[in-house]
Amino acid sequence: VSAMESSVRIIGEYTGEGKFFLGEIPPYLDIIDVQKAPYKVKLTDSSFEIELERYVERDGTLYDRLLSKWAIYKEGVERDQLVSHAHQADEIHAFQNLPAIKLTSKKGLGGIIPNQYISDFTSLGISSATINVCITQFMHLTPRAGDIAHTYGGRTYYMDEGYLKSLLDVPLLEAAKRNIAVAAIILVEPAAKCVDPDLGVLLQHPDYERGVYTMPNMTTLESVNCYAAAFDFLAKRYCTADNRYGRIAHWIMHNEVDGGLSWTNMGVKPVTIFSDTYIKSMRMCYNIVRQYDEHAEVFASFSHSWTDISNVGDRKSTR
């Protein structure tokens, strides 16, 4: 699968008797629950190469098929049969060519913030760092004084420029001056803690029960577009050739997912369901940010325990 500048090319093959088609699975659809695939292309040859428009209008949103995965189905009467693994984009068109930040030492610093100790970056001799980026602390659905408008998917969202300048730009600029590779830890608060409650309702997972952070809601097109817009804005701002606001080199998704009930909550779920949702979130970030920085990496987040079980009783699942 190749996501090019204005189209998506899917190449594959299949064998067997019957009617087959290529199915598109956007993040807001659960591939296991799909009875009749809503977005499909009929296959007439066992080996195929299909090129589709990358951007399509869906329910008032200009959806980017970069976010979709693709699979082969066999047509059924009541239910279509999934006959292949789903496949994400292998190649992603990059808008620009940023140089990679090479690590010069093993030494790093966790959770950098704007304070009087920033000058210690030099004396510490660090080569990497992390920074918490909680998107629900600066993103709004309606404009407020001092906001920056950002349009994605045909919808406009608003970002608190004062927050960005003081809490993110300052440490990221200082890190960029020293060629420190910074990884952003992406966090989503539950609706009750969000600066914009309406945004919180949109991004809080529908099965959230408790905990510090929620798994993002990716069950509707509206929520997916909003979540994707946050990544698009962050990558556009913090992946530039001149590092005008600082640089985010890598992305860490959420917090300690092995303790998901407290740190990335979506209720009590089978491990397979939780993992599938988590991978959707990771993939959405990866596919978007790699357009701006082809060297960017996306990492999973786990607890800091090496020899003992961490978060005992906090990673429950049904079998």
Where are the predicted features?
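Beta-strand-enriched, solvent-exposed domains that form extended recognition/catalytic surfaces
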Residues: 1-97
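Short, solvent-exposed coil/turn segments at beta-strand boundaries
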Residues: 4-5, 124-125, 318
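Alpha-helix termini
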Residues: 56-58, 237-246, 290-293
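Noncatalytic carbohydrate-binding groove/subsite architecture in carbohydrate-active enzymes
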Residues: 101, 230, 247, 274-319
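Alpha/beta-hydrolase-fold catalytic nucleophile elbow
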Residues: 254-255, 301
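Catalytic metal-binding/acid-base residues of hydrolase active sites
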Residues: 257-258, 304
